[in-house]
Amino acid sequence: MFKGIRKRASNLSIYAVTSNLSATNAPSDQQPASNSPSSYESILSQVHDFEIALKAMDYLLDDRTQQGTELLHEQAQLGSSDGKPHAIFPLALGVMEFIEATLGFEPEVMARAHKTLNDAESASTTNAKYNVRHQLATSNIYPPGTEFQVTLAESTLLNALLMLLTENNGMVESVKALYKLRKAYQTLDAVYKKIKELEPVFNRNLAKLRKAANKGLLEVPRLNGLVNGGTRLKHSISTVDLPGYESLGSSSSSSSATLPEDLKLMKNLEKIYLMRKARIEGTNLGNNTGVQHQPLNLFSDLASSIAMKQNGNGVETSLPIIPQYGKFNNGNEEQVEEQEEEGEGEEEEEENSDNEHFVDAVEELTIGDINSSSLADSSAQSILSSVETSPSEVQSTDMHLHVSTTDEFIHSGVQLCFGILQVVLSLIPPAIGKVLSIVGFKGERETGLKLLWKTAITSRNVHGELALLFLLMFYDGPVQFVDTGFRLPSANKLKNIINLENKTSVTDDEVELIKDSPESYTSQLLKRARHHFPHNALWILQEGRMLAAEGRLAQASTLMQNFTDNPNNKIQMQQIEALLIFDRATIYIYMHEYDKAARDLIYLIEINSWSKAVYLFMAAACYLERYRMVRMGLQSPQINADTKLSLNGDVELEAKKYSDLFTKYLNLSLSYVPGHGANAQKKGGLGGSGKQMPFDKFLLRKWKHIEQRKKRHPELSLADVVGTSLIHELIYFWNGYNRMSPQDFELALKLLGYSGAPNTELSANTLHNNYAKIEETEDEAMIRYFLQSVALRQLGKVKQGLGILDSHVISKYVISEVPQFRFHKMTYSPYLYPTAFYEKTMFVWLLRTSESTIKQDVGRAVHECKSYLKKAETVGEGDYELSNRTSMRIKAAGDRLDQLGSLSR
């Protein structure tokens, strides 16, 4: 699971109590932690809690949040009377509420999640101290309490992020959030170093387990006389979830008086094992249960993975290795078959009842009940039942099932949280990043991505799926966190793709290959997630985003539309429904299907309170663009010829309809902007707060320009006093110019020309045929030419696009570039001036590294491009609307160029 991670000495301090595992001088042949028999029940109870929590969070991933919440509350009530802490339940509930809160930003959901995560922090601290005080080792390699250090770090991290995302927080709350973030960072850093330090121990323990299970048959003297005397049992009872427990055959001197307790432990171990097995195979929620099964051989990848057994005739026959529990038999094959059939029913019963209390063996099985004639009917049949799995899962479950639930949680939890922290910190603009590094924060994007990829590939739990969601957002989300436009020509050549199916470990070298072509691997992982969680629209949303990122817009919109149109599909989480519909609306915009986009955007104000002003403004911009399309006689490329609008005498009527719709929804959008107009007190902004969002400020600036022109031209409608296309500016900031097809760009060029001055470059107007009713100002022309230059580049007309950008945009505010860079500080459209230099880096890169270039010099290209990025940073200094998005793009491009520069050396 952790192949390729460098070993690095470090210490992990878990409170002031000495643990049973020295972090600083662990010997190379270190044995698993040892627990006293009196602690076995407490340990297995905690492990059972973790499996319950993981199952509950899987319900969330399958859009069955209510079932997951009910499971947690039920288990919390059952455990409330035992006097033991159950820290994982508040964390699981907090994770579920955090995801719900950050999907929709509703203030009441965010407040509820904040309270739950506070409870999770307190419970984690209490449970960590409890395990240290009672020396409860639930891990084979980590000190007692480590798992609850991870739950503490996870709850602290999520709580800090939630506090930072709550915009109406004051300075005190923001400082508290940063303190929590620092606390989580330090804990995760310490545990991560410990994981790397103890990786050899982890691998040796796993190897010993596999070797021991493969040695052959094992005497079980404690059960002598129960079944035909001297039964020989395959050593397949794994005690990986109970460190230090001695197997049945390890103490021949033990009396039969301890048998009920042993059976109790075995029963509880079996329950945990079956829960983990079902989770890993994706059947724990009742999904994917119709697959044909065959007995599982956990060691099928080893040369000697088949155990040999002599039948009654002295002939050796091969038997599949049973993963944890052997089976009583006396060499009679018919009896074995009968027991296997009975075991199937028992296993199904166990998987459907994992929320029950653990078995009390003393109550269920007394000493007097034990005899050879009745044993076949006892609970031992279930304990020693065979385990089955689907053929496709045989390889994948080998390592997963022999890693304890606790170790799995520690590894995947640390990798997820520390990976996210590393990436998020690396995205912070340099000026802020330097300040944070002084107080202990340091983000390394490559390290973070490596951890997230490993978690997404190797972990079949909520951490693995959240890592996948983060990667999908990072690579394919509407906000550009990574700039994949800077590529070398050789990068487009077909490479061997690694098959991630059933992959339980991944090396650093493999991760590097994966990061070079992420789209080839996120698709594989997404397919697996959709298979495990078929009911959740979240995965439909992610697949739609992935298709859109690949330019397959029609497929993306059809996938999303068909899902919501199907009456059998019920989306339980309204936040996911809102995200899916918003993304579908943006895809319709990219395709110039503005009626469908406006329909979706207007519907959003009924189900989501994120920013009604932005939804309505975007809908208004869609109707404005339809108005222009009608007047120009244009239609979306997706509309068939026989369905196109008849342009005989209906043009003016149709145009007036869209003009009126634009006016209606523009005015309505203004009423939802916090602090503006007569309806200033209406709910609006992020999380319904009174603070204006960046796009609210963008909306108000655009309205100011429209209002000024309306005063100069009172005889014109609002639709006729708008300058450059509003929706195309919005398309750019929602990353649409990296998703549109050539046909969409061709239409975009024409529509952008609607507002152009007559007979100017790329204008749709002439002296004899003029659509625009107002004069194009230089500021509006700069916006138009900027967007048209990018469209030309995407159409392959790189030199023409760069010429437009230089002559009609950059030259308007740059005074000189050499020997000293000087420029006019313009304020009409603040985002435009740094963004133009950012886009110039892409033009220059394509020209300097194209295959037609006689000699490619990647180093020079990187140096030249970075010089333009430096100018973008200089021009973009200061706080302005959309400044975060602009600076994020610039930083993403700089990081990518640094990476390419290091490869060229």
Swiss-Prot record:
Spans annotated as Disordered: 325-356
What keyword terms does UniProt attach to this protein?
Cytoplasm, Nucleus, Phosphoprotein
Pfam families reported for this sequence: Iml2-TPR_39 (PF10300)
Q: Where in the cell is it found?
A: Cytoplasm; Nucleus
- Top-rank taxon of the source lineage equals Eukaryota
Q: Where is the composition biased (Acidic residues)?
A: 334-353
Q: Chief localization class?
A: cytoplasm
Q: Name one GO cellular component term.
A: nucleus
Checking InterPro entries in the record gives: Iml2/TPR_39, TPR-like_helical_dom_sf
Record bears the keyword Chaperone: no
Q: Give the record's family classification.
A: Belongs to the IML2 family.
* Record note on quaternary structure: Interacts with lipid droplet proteins.
What this protein is reported to do is described as: Inclusion body (IB) resident protein that interacts strongly with lipid droplet (LD) proteins. Involved in LD-mediated IB clearing after protein folding stress, probably by enabling access to the IBs of an LD-stored soluble sterol derivative that acts as a chaperone in inclusion clearing.
Q: Which PANTHER family match?
A: TETRATRICOPEPTIDE REPEAT PROTEIN 39 FAMILY MEMBER (PTHR31859), TETRATRICOPEPTIDE REPEAT PROTEIN 39C (PTHR31859:SF1)
Protein's name in the database:
Inclusion body clearance protein IML2
Q: State the encoding gene.
A: IML2
